[in-house]
A protein has these predicted regions:
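Outer-membrane beta-barrel proteins and related beta-barrel translocases across Gram-negative bacteria
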Residues: 1-167
Length: 167
């Protein structure tokens, strides 16, 4: 594998595995951070799995993957705009079949969840808040995927139309 730090804002890890039966795996991981602005982490994993001997009964070949991304914005960056993401999606059998993910908590976890949201506050009188949120839920046992496409929400500060502005 390789570890690179191309700048002070992010790093990159490239890892690969090769097994004698022809199976292989690749992992790309990166962390990024800009002080007082944002930070996050991205992980992409892919494996090509071969089981058995080619030409014999029981031979199988499969591809599995997992993508994780987290991003958060520092509240000091822009107090009126906010973006955050927590993404975890992949093959339904990734944690059961992966050669590099043999740990009980991940193996027993049956759901992969994701959420991405953006909100904005418009200053003024009255102030207006709007937000968009999208989410994803994946059950690895039943192999069902539920997507909630962007949901819009808007709020307006309470207005008192018959109250004098001065006094």
């Amino acid at each position: 594998g390789y570890y690179l730090a191309p700048s002070e804002y992010f790093d990159l890890t490239l890892l690969g595995d090769y097994y004698t039966n022809g199976s292989y795996g690749m992992r790309v991981e990166s962390s990024y951070r800009k002080r007082y602005s944002f930070n996050g982490r991205l992980s992409v994993r892919f494996e090509n799995l071969i089981d058995g001997e080619r030409g014999l009964p029981g031979y199988s070949k499969s591809n599995i993957y997992n993508i994780r991304w987290t991003h958060s914005q520092d509240s000091k960056a822009n107090p009126y705009n906010r973006f955050s993401a927590s993404v975890n999606l992949g093959s339904s059998n990734y944690f059961r079949e992966s050669l590099n993910q043999i740990n009980t908590p991940n193996f027993l976890n049956n759901t992969l969840n994701s959420s991405v949201s953006f909100s904005k506050t418009f200053r003024g009188s009255p102030s207006v808040n709007v937000s968009l949120t999208a989410s994803h839920s994946q059950n690895t046992r039943s192999k069902t995927v539920n997507l909630v496409l962007p949901t819009f929400q808007g709020n307006v500060e309470r207005v008192y139309p018959f109250v004098k502005k001065n006094g």
